[in-house]
Amino acid sequence: MAAKPAPFGQSCSNCHKTTTSLWRRGPDNSLLCNACGLYQKHRKHARPVKSEDLKDISPLIQQVCKNGTCAGDGFCNGTGGSASCTGCPALNNRIRSLNASKSQSGRKSLSPNPSSVPSSTETKASPTPLESKPQIVSDTTTETSNGTSRRRSSHNQHEDSSPPHEPSVTFCQNCATTNTPLWRRDESGNPICNACGLYYKIHGVHRPVTMKKAIIKRRKRLVFNGNANESQHNLKRMSSGDSGSSVKQQSTRDGPFSKSFPNGNGHASGNSGEGLAEHGMNTGVLPPASTFPSYNSNFTGFLPSSFNPSPLMTLSRLAAGEPDNNGKVYYSYGPTQEQSILPLPENKHEGLPPYQNEYVPNGIRANQVVYPGQLVAVGNDSSKQLSESTTSNTDNNGVATANQSNPLGMKFHLPPILPVGESVCLPPRTSAKPRIAEGIASLLNPEEPPSNSDKQPSMSNGPKSEVSPSQSQQAPLIQSSTSPVSLQFPPEVQGSNVDKRNYALNVLSQLRSQHDLMIQELHNLNQHIQQIDEWLRSSDNENMASEHIKSSTPAVVASGALQT
């Protein structure tokens, strides 16, 4: 006994079952039932089926699926013809309509009054009342509940690949098509196709009949027809629109309401695949970024070759004689382009100019020229002579001229020092103790004169001898005067003089520690500067000596030639 055909023509390609809990896809994109799909997924080959369990496909379904013209590349016409079309909603609807028409013709052939039944040729020639129903309705307009007019198209106005409408066949009440992947309903409850339903949902009006297409763009699937040339041709047809036949097929599918994308000039271009034609999907090369409208072409393509996280490391390397990276040093704490320790070029237009940055790390600007000559260590007497020679060599405009300490006559740029965190030498802040910054500001900037009881005791009396010897040997930061200095303490230490004294000693120790750190950093900088200056002097002397030897050698040879 032959198996009952599926009402929608959906059956497994392996066992031909029409019912399953879940439909799956095989490696060739064919439709499989749940059992065959899981077997194929885990064992990588088809599930064996017994001969008695094998279901036969209806001849009508075999004919439709074999003689169809659909390529299965995402542009569906509901006729079948490829493995991807199995289970397509449009194909299922077509097979159901064919089954309904076949059963209807069978019932007419079994009618007791054969004279009332027209012949097969008359049935094909003359439309039935149900078939001509959309044509009659197309000339009239009906008012909906929203007050908008609905237009219904006739079956003869736009050719449809579906057969004549039957009572069991669902067709769109707006465009009279039976080829759709999803059925929807309008505000009155009538079935409409997916395109008309989405158009009404988005725009609030019914879809014009002129937008009707015979081909539906479905989800793109891979094509496994066994013909590689045909599949490649389909991919090229979708990616490019320059060939003649491809453009014609593209325009046939898209219709008069095809989308157009703006080009670089801001005008709409009908062919959106020109960029992909040159840089297609098959080549794997993306189109250049300049073809996009919103692309900014001001990027010069300059990227730093290396990053140096520490300027002090750069100074030590230069002092050891190592060359820098093409005259440019980059720091990780700022986005600016810094210059190296080498002399600045005479032509300022060569290369990229340094960017101007408002961020001033540690009080030194990024492009500020520092120390035009040799620096002397702090505390030497020669520092005064250097300052006097520098001031004496300044002209009326205030511009310093080259002196003997700078034989090259060029200015050098030193990178700024990385800011040191304030948590290096400071004690942890607690809620009980006031902030150090507030204490320094209150001590150095008194707002109102304190009372006589708030005066700090003299530095030579009483417990002042408890100061450590290291602090007593150092020179005070502020010169002591005959009259005691008036200080204003924060409200947390407005108690006894002992609390004020302890607070003042704490602030003084913090200031001295910061002073020691600054002195040490300046000492290290002076050592590096002296080493660099000595190296530059020695290299300059070597260059001058080599030039002198080259200039004197031809004269000796010439004199020898004259003597001979």
Curated annotation (Swiss-Prot):
Any single Gene Ontology cellular-component annotation: chromatin
Region (Disordered): 100-170, 226-285, 381-409, 443-496
Pfam families with a match to the protein in the record: GATA
Biased composition (Low complexity): 109-120
Biased composition range(s): Polar residues: 135-148, 240-253, 260-271, 381-407, 450-486
InterPro entries for the chain: Transcription_factor_GATA, Znf_GATA, Znf_NHR/GATA
Residues with PTM Phosphoserine: S109
Record function comment: Transcriptional repressor that binds the consensus promoter sequence 5'-[AT]GATAA-3' during iron-replete conditions to down-regulate transcription of target genes. Represses the expression of the iron transporter fio1 in response to high iron concentrations. Also represses the expression of str1, str2 and str3. Represses the expression of shu1 in presence of iron.
Identification of the protein by name: Iron-sensing transcriptional repressor
Species, as recorded: Schizosaccharomyces pombe (strain 972 / ATCC 24843) (Fission yeast)
Organismal lineage: Eukaryota, Fungi, Dikarya, Ascomycota, Taphrinomycotina
